[in-house]
Swiss-Prot record:
Organism: Scophthalmus maximus
PANTHER family per UniProt: TRANSLATIONALLY CONTROLLED TUMOR PROTEIN-RELATED, TRANSLATIONALLY-CONTROLLED TUMOR PROTEIN
Pfam families xrefs: TCTP (PF00838)
Family in the record: Belongs to the TCTP family.
Name of the protein this chain belongs to: Translationally-controlled tumor protein homolog
One GO location term (cellular component): cytoplasm
Source superkingdom: Eukaryota
Gene this protein is translated from: tpt1
Keyword annotations of the record: Calcium, Cytoplasm
Function comment: Involved in calcium binding and microtubule stabilization.
Phylogenetic lineage: Eukaryota, Metazoa, Chordata, Craniata, Vertebrata
Domain TCTP: 1-170
C-alpha cells in the first residue's frame, strides 16, 4: 500500500486504495472516494464489567459515522475559508511549497511554478463548490484538501497538490 502524506506537516492525506488521476498537467491529483456509513461496535470487555454478574445488562450502542471514506479513513479535519482567506492561504502555501521543492526536488520547481498558476485559477473559479480539509495535525500552513462532487452530485472527489505530497510505501 502507498500512503500519500503532506510534505510540510507529515499528515496522512490518502492512500492508493482510491482511484487517482492527474489534473492540470500533473499539478493536482484527483482522488475519487465514496460516501459510506460505518458502524463501530463497542467491546464490552473494554469496560471491565462482568456481564453475567449484572442483573440487567444494557446493550452498548454502536457508534455510527457516515461521510466520505477518504476523510474518515485518513482523519481529515474540516476547516472553513472565505475566498479572501483562501487566496491568502494558497499564496503562502505555494511559496512554502516552492521553497521545499527547491530543497528536495529542484528539477521540478519550474514545472510546478508554471502549472500552479492555472491550478489555482481553476480552484478560485470553482471556489464555492469546495469544502476544505486539513490533515490530522490541523496545521493550517500545510496542505488543504479540496472536496467536490462529480456532475452526478453523488461521487465525492478530493483534490491535492501533487508536489505537496510525499509517498510512503507500507
Amino acid at each position: 500500500m502507498i500512503i500519500y502524506k503532506d510534505l510540510l506537516s507529515g499528515d496522512e492525506m490518502f492512500s492508493n486504495i482510491y482511484k487517482i488521476r492527474e489534473l492540470e498537467g500533473g499539478i493536482l491529483l484527483e482522488v475519487e472516494g465514496k460516501r459510506i456509513t460505518r458502524t463501530e461496535a463497542i467491546d464490552d470487555s473494554a469496560f471491565g464489567a462482568n456481564p453475567s454478574a449484572e442483573e440487567l445488562s444494557e446493550a452498548n450502542e454502536a457508534a455510527v459515522s457516515s461521510g466520505v471514506d477518504i476523510i474518515l479513513n485518513h482523519k481529515l479535519i474540516s476547516t472553513l475559508y472565505n475566498k479572501k482567506q483562501y487566496s491568502a492561504y494558497i499564496k503562502k502555501y505555494m511559496k512554502d511549497l516552492k521553497t521545499k521543492l527547491e530543497e528536495t526536488n529542484p528539477e521540478r520547481v519550474d514545472a510546478f511554478v508554471a502549472g500552479a498558476v492555472g491550478a489555482v485559477k481553476m480552484i478560485l473559479g470553482k471556489f464555492k463548490d469546495f469544502e476544505f480539509y486539513t490533515g490530522e495535525s490541523m496545521n493550517h500552513d500545510a496542505m488543504v484538501g479540496l472536496l467536490d462532487y462529480r456532475e452526478d452530485g453523488i461521487t465525492p472527489i478530493m483534490l491535492f497538490f501533487k508536489d505537496g505530497l510525499e509517498i510512503e510505501k507500507c
